[in-house]
Amino acid sequence: MKTLKVLKIFIIVYISSVSLESFAGFGESCSNLPITSDGYLETYTAYGYIIRSIDMKDPRGNCNPSTSSITFCFKNVEGSASPCTIYTLNEGDTRKISDLSTDNNPDLGANTVLKNIVLTVKKFGNDLCLAMPTSRGPMPVACKSLSVTPTATKPKDENCNIGKSCYTGANYSQSLINFSGLAVQCLSETLNKIFFTGSSCSAQDQNSRITHLASFATFQGYLKRIIGAALILYTMFFAFNMALNKEYATTEKITLFIIKFLFVVYFSIGLGPLDFSGGQPVKENGMLKYGLPLLTGAAPDFAGMIFNAAGSRGLCQFDNTKYKDGYKFYGLWDAIDCRIGYYLGLDLLYNIDKNGILGRPVSNGTSGNNKPIPNFDPDGKKDRPHDLSKAGALRFFTVMFGFFMSGHVIILVAGMVFSVIFLSILLYFITHYLVCMVTIYVMTYISPIFIPMVLFTRTKAYFDGWLKVCISCALQPAVVAGFIALLITMYDSAIFKNCEFLRYDYEKGDIRFSTFELRLPSIDADKCQESFGYKMLKYYAGEGWEEHLLILFPIKSIVRDVVSILAELLCVLIFSVIFYYFSKSIGRFAADLTNGPNMDAVTASPTKIVDLVKKGAAFLKDASVHEHGKSSLGDKPDIGNKRKDGAQQGEDAVNSSGGEVADLASGSGGGK
């Protein structure tokens, strides 16, 4: 009997394990899924979690390659009667996670992050897959092979005129907040694609009768043929003059002609074929190979050298050796974007990896105090506003609102003026750089017209003007960067004084970024603790906030260190006002210094935002005065009648006095 009982228990356990195994094979697909080289998506993102919630080899499933639908079993909440629910979708069907997980599964359908993810059935080569959007594009979470191999079709590039860095350029930056470097790289690749390499757009849409115009690169090719023909004629005329006039047959003139002619041909229409690309002969153009990279690279190099020499010790100073080849110019723009984030209290830039989820950081920087200051996750600070703990929040404005709620309007106004002027000047620098870069690309595009003009005495002035514009546009950003570097130095000195910053370098796959933490210096630490930036970081951490009732509603405000904060902020404001007025003439100064065109007419004015704020304030003031005048008139409805009566009485008095004067005149006349 005992043997039979043991045998029954063994059979029951075996059957249960087999059934559980048949239903619990989550993460299994009919065909193999593509795996990323670094395994990042499968391990650290929602993509891998969704894969481990789907089973395609369930006994109720269907991996038949002849069917045009996909069947999968989606995981249910733990403890349900069935481990998963079967779904069958056709190609092109879409479902949200919340539609597939209808049992309020807190890990799937009821999860605020996952419930809105849309899964789509689409083809990936010879596989029919259930795909979801990821940071690396749509990726399949479950697939099955099809019996018929689809015909290979060339993928259509929907954004054929836009550079790829417009979507992937952020991966080359080391700053968590990056937009200016992305804008520069995006514009550079787009201009290069439009002007020189040509777009991948088809000449004619299949669904329309509209034929696109020839690209800029095609037009320049025709232009180079015309210039080449003109240069041939120039050579023929020089040969005729040399044959007819012995003065042209000297060795000096012939040598000078050959050297000048070769340089003109090489930099205008190119010499070739000197290179082979993909087995095809390609002309080598000196302007595209040397001129354009030199002009576009000189601006960020000069500006970066000046800009990196400024600022607080360690703040926003990235490791240039970690930038990929061809993307080292990101260092300049990362420094700008990083400072915008730190000045405005962006939460992502400080103490981001306190839980160690991003990997092991590499510390670089000062050798001062090794303790993070201040502590950004303190216990017992219940009075801090909820907005301070939101990821990506600009906590500077939250703190300014805290001062406003405590009645310190002057601090709020000073803080707003500082932020507006600071952002306006940096926006001016970015737009000035972009305009200069566009000008360089345009000058390079029309270079086949102007470079041959150096051969003729009458047209050499046009070449000199063209060359002057190119050199000026390469140097003007460096001049403006010197002004910005001075501004950054003054701001860092006024805001952080002698504080030091420790850099943390993080690396996950191809993505690299750095954060900076404030450290007290080994000497004069009290000076750093009294700085405006240090106290603002304490407010960001939740220190110094108090909660009190305003009428019936609880509000949170700041009442500590108000006098010192006001004094420090007014010092920053003084520098802001000085640079505000100086920024009005920086564009003209850069143009005069480089003997080039003034770009202020086509750039964002450094005072534009402040001027708009002034106009808005004046408009509100005029509207208030006008409304007040209307209310005053409404209180005195008989003013108009009284004015009319008074005017009538005045006219009668004038007429009466006029009559008396006339009578006196006639009387005096009669006396005579």
Swiss-Prot record:
InterPro entries: Conjugal_tfr_TrbL/VirB6. Residues 1-24 form the signal peptide. It is a multi-pass membrane protein. Pfam families: TrbL. One of its GO terms (cellular component) is plasma membrane. GO terms for biological process: protein secretion by the type IV secretion system. It is found in: Cell membrane. The chain crosses the membrane at residues 226-246, 254-274, 410-430, 436-456, 469-489, 562-582. Coiled coil: none annotated. Residues 363-372 have a biased composition (Polar residues). It comes from the Bacteria. Its main location: membrane. Disulfide bonds: none annotated. Keywords: Cell membrane, Membrane, Signal, Transmembrane, Transmembrane helix. Residues 628-646 have a biased composition (Basic and acidic residues). The keyword Signal applies. Residues 363-384, 628-672 are annotated as: Disordered. Belongs to the TrbL/VirB6 family. This is Uncharacterized protein RP105. It comes from Rickettsia prowazekii (strain Madrid E).
